[in-house]
Amino acid sequence: HLPDDEREAVIRFNMPRLLDRGFFDEAALRSAIATARAQGWVNLNTGLIPGMAGVAVPVFDALGRPVAALSVGTLAERLHDERLPNVAAILTAEARALGAALNPFDPTLRYPSRALSAVEGGLAKIR
């Protein structure tokens, strides 16, 4: 759900790491992104961590921009095909409630890199 240019930058940045782990090639990643956008959630049970699986949903602000994500990680056997849609639906409902409660004037949402810089600068002064 990111703007095209931002999505492409994220893919370019992360692709070497994904390839290094044998996790995804670029075509598979792009296919997974398209599927996630269409269904509204993403699920991975690929063996990155043997026996683990997860599902994640985006959290949108009042303008429909993705600002966060909610996810659940569990044992792969607990996130089976019958249970997965229910877990995704619960996460989606919670993400909508969270998104509706976000303050649109919070500078952290509008300029996350500035907010993180301020936090890091403050921490540097404390150390």
Language-model-derived ranges and their functions:
Residues 1-48:
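Short, solvent-exposed recognition segments
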Residues 59-62:
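Sensor-regulatory modules in signal-transduction proteins
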Residues 20-23, 57, 84:
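Short capping/connector residues at structural and topological boundaries
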Residues 39, 50-51, 68-127:
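Juxtadomain coupling helices with adjacent low-complexity linkers
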